[in-house]
Amino acid sequence: AISKGFKVGVAAFPDGHPASAANPTQDLDVLAQKAKLGASFATTQFFFDVNKWEQLVSALAKKGVNIPVIPGILPITNLKQLNRMADLSGTSIPDSVANRINSVSESDVSKVGIEIATEFSEELLKAGAPGLHFFTMNNSDSTYQIVQNLNIAK
């Protein structure tokens, strides 16, 4: 049992866990088991498709699991870093994102990446996300700009 007032967060994988060969049923069962063992919330690996978050939350609810699932956002500030992180995590980069990033010069990648992350964050919040988790990659400036764009800072 977990002490009263103490919360435990666990990982969730909208694109599938890299070690599970993208077996959504297995990933969902593991996440549901984490919740049944006392997890208070889940934070996802970064991803780029709001439908995947909605499907994950819906599938958990069908299993009777209603913990908050906080989506992970990776502000794209560097193309090389994005590709490396996607390879390591098994996260897919939608054509719509890749096309926008690949259509600009390296010096504009961060600007467009912030636009993409802002739009994605807006979609997630509109879909009911309980909050957002940013993978800052030691670059809090981009996250600060996204929060300003969302007009959620106090």
Give the ranges of each region predicted by the language model.
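Aromatic/hydrophobic pocket-lining residues that form the small-molecule binding cavity
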Residues: 27, 31, 53, 113, ...
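Conserved, mostly hydrophobic/aromatic
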Residues: 34, 38, 71, 132
